[in-house]
């Protein structure tokens, strides 16, 4: 006789609409902020709108995930729902992969198609008419129109902070894996220790990246206004930094849950999802280190 799994269907929730409004307000505030900066408006409501949107998103995350945690610990979830969570997280990471595929694609297009074309490769017509003295080299320290887009004085060496950050993130992948094995074996002390070390490594990475950005802006002249090189550099490293920030927050929440006695060797998907996300962030950074800093 066939057995049927129960499938928990929650009541109607306010969290999806709060998530939608929060994300809209956040993006609108950020766009307003950037536009006002470009227009040199002394007073801008963009930062305030962005902050309000961020608060709404934070409220939604704590409330929605808190409800999911309570339902899970109450035994309302079935193996079928666990599979749904795993598929959902897998597709979410896949969508994030596509983001970075697009950004890396933009970098490769700029390096191998558009900028070489401006320097005279291919038809040469456009470059001879507008920028006859422009020569292609990457990293781009000589923009076609230096008056409009001043090029950076120099680029960031990969063998300083970027290499250190690579060591930190690769080490954090090792520590989160050790923590995961400790969870499976029921070694709570080792689990707490190695997960805390992972969180600290993530915080250290973010601190060094902030130092790198300050150095780039103040001393190297490498900014968002430094032409296409600055734009692609900050787009890729900044978007990745946002993911490291999110991942570090997630790992910290996992640590707080573990300190409260959550998770065991059978019920641990929240921790597994966090570790999947962290490994994804680490792999992306290796690609960034190679293609943005080294090559």
Give the label of every model feature segment.
Residues 1-295:
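...captures the hydrophobic TM-helix bundle architecture rather than a specific catalytic motif
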